[in-house]
Amino acid sequence: MSHKFLEPIKIGNQTVKNRVMFLAMAKNISNFDDSVSAKDIAYVESVAAGGVGLLVPGAMIVDPEWPSVLPLQPGIYDDRFIPGLRRLVLAAHKYDAKILFQLWHPGATNYSGIDPKTVDELTKDEIHAIQDKFVAAAKRAMAAGADGIEFQTCHGYLACQFISPLFNHRTDEYGWNKVEDPTRFA
C-alpha cells in the first residue's frame, strides 16, 4: 500500500521527492558573528538524511540593527554569509531534499529591554528600508542556491505585527482601514 505523503509533489517549479516536511525551529547553534556554523550544517544534513522532502532550517536574520529575540541564528543580511548558506543548501541537496530559507525580522519583539508596547511606530521610510532588506535577503537566498524562501509571519514578529489587529493600530495605509492594508508590508 502506498501512502500519499510519500509521493512526490510539485510546488511552483520545484518537484519535492515526498510530502514530508521539516519546518523551522530555533536551534541557537549558529556562530556569534551570525555566520553558519558546523552545527548548522550537521543539523541540516541529519534532517535531510532522515528522508524529508523539504526542510526549513530556521529563522534567518534580515536586519542586524534590531536586537535578536532568538540568539545564535544565521544571518542573511550580508553577502559574506552566502558561502555558509550555500553549505546548508549542499547538505540538504546531498540527500535530494529541498531547502527553504525563512526570512525573519523580530520587530518590537526583542530582548533589548524595551517593552514592545513602547516601541515607536515605524515611519514609512523605515518600513521601506526594512522591505528592501527582505528583498536583499531573498536575493542572497537565491544566490546561495536555496530552493525558495519563507516569509516569517507568526509568533508576534514584525510581519505578524502588521497583519494582526492585536498589534497593528496604524491609521495609515499599513493599518486596518481596509482588510488588504496590513498586507502591504509583505
Task: Please provide the spans of the model-predicted regions.
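Flavin-dependent oxidoreductase catalytic cores
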Residues: 1-186
